[in-house]
Curated annotation (Swiss-Prot):
The enzyme's E.C. designation: 4.3.1.19
Assembly behavior: Homotetramer.
Domain ACT-like span(s) in chain numbering: 338-409, 432-504
Biological processes per GO annotation: isoleucine biosynthetic process; L-serine catabolic process; threonine catabolic process; threonine metabolic process
Protein name as catalogued: L-threonine dehydratase biosynthetic IlvA
Keyword Amino-acid biosynthesis included in the entry's annotation: yes
SUPFAM superfamilies listed in its UniProt record: ACT-like, Tryptophan synthase beta subunit-like PLP-dependent enzymes
Coiled coil location: none
Species whose genome carries this gene: Pasteurella multocida (strain Pm70)
Pathway given in the UniProt record: Amino-acid biosynthesis; L-isoleucine biosynthesis; 2-oxobutanoate from L-threonine: step 1/1
Family: Belongs to the serine/threonine dehydratase family.
Native organism taxonomy: Bacteria, Pseudomonadati, Pseudomonadota, Gammaproteobacteria, Pasteurellales
Amino acid sequence: MVNNLHSAHPTGAEYLKAVLSSKVYDVAQVTPLQDMAKLSERLGNKVFIKREDRQPVHSFKLRGAYAMIAGLSAEQKASGVIAASAGNHAQGVALSAKHLGLRALIVMPQNTPSIKVDAVRGFGGEVLLHGANFDEAKAKAIELAESKNMTFIPPFDHPAVIAGQGSIAMELLQQNSQIDRIFVPVGGGGLAAGIAVLIKQLMPEIKVIGVESKDSACLYRALKAGKPIDLDRVGLFADGVAVKRIGDETFRVCQQYIDDVVLVDGDEICAAVKDIFENVRAIAEPSGALSLAGLKKYVKEHNIQGETLVNVLSGANLNFHTLRYVSERCEIGEQHEALLAVTIPEQPGSFLKFCHILGHVPVTEFKYRYADDKQACIFVGVRITGQEEKQTIINQLQQNGYDLIDLSNDDIAKTHVRYMIGGRSNSPLKERLYSFEFPEQKGALLKFLETLGQTHWNISVFHYRAHGADYGNVLAGFQLNDEDLDAFNQHLEKLGYVYQDVTESPAYRYFLV
């Protein structure tokens, strides 16, 4: 390497020097810092968004990739570079190598959507499809790096990559010197580490807040444990930050310089995607909206007013059909919609009476199916202004004698059951309900069904709906006796799909049992 970082664990001053001498602007752009006027008024703070979606590859990843590749020795450059990625890092490496006239080989999992493969090839990268997941692709890339004497370019855990991402912080200070807090998305930690170490060298009074998805919180868990640890599984909606283990160097830097970490869920991310569109007319990928989701939550939880707050739109490489899912979930994430399961008497006029009690509350969704002569279960969505109004509606219904369950935070209800209202089985079943994940690609659902069909247990309920993501989600019920349960779960382990037993879901119990 010929860059300024000669240590595996540089000091803050060494990182600062590396950022100041970085060559990232050979290929990267100085991206705008835009005012989010509507959101600023709503939150009582000055909110700004750093538009990294405006980079040539539509994400910040170009900075770190180019910083490392440009710093290679002439001998290393002559041998070419290799990386493993199914996302933004792949495009950053491909474009960086193309700009420098180098060979770039990107190893991508075999189930990578063709749109992402084509994007890498469009930036001049060679693509090798290998392995069923990222870990297998990465292992192959490291093997090829050794056998072909190519340099492996990691997505986050390298000082040169961290320094490249840190160039964003330098731009922020030049664009607005009055910043109070910067909210940064965290996956492997490269962006958070780069921004934090630079900020704390120059303006340590600025707070740097890491934002993680609740189901991919590798930094939060590492900070609690005092060291990087492996997560058992990660959520895949915000795939750009779906990392099982934070990097060793990124953790060291984040542990030293990050001020706090906030966790958000998928619905809060969806609401942030909507906010970004409404304020600056940009469409962020889920991980790209992560830091804004964290900003909004942090402001509310800590009652922050009158400050200047910055969030980073880290990327905008998303499948268009993901927007359908975002649109459906953003109202719940903004606490503008409540989902309720309500029991009403099965008699003439009871349905109308229920509607009268709701009064002028806007109804967003209403599903009903006759079940028996005694009572009916209805699934109702109502538009609300916040938690207080939701509780008022719940209290009003309960005071009128209705039994109900709030399903607003029930993921099985939001993802599956709301599309399945149609009555219970007429036959009593010994049934267990499972949620499965499988890679989305042509023929993937058929392959899943064929694999699942290898069981001799009867499928009693099934729901699948495409959301434009890299992974699909299926809800399936099986007729199982208690004595079959251990054998069945052992069989599921052998199938290789990520799964979860969700038999105790309130939505399932209310509508499908």
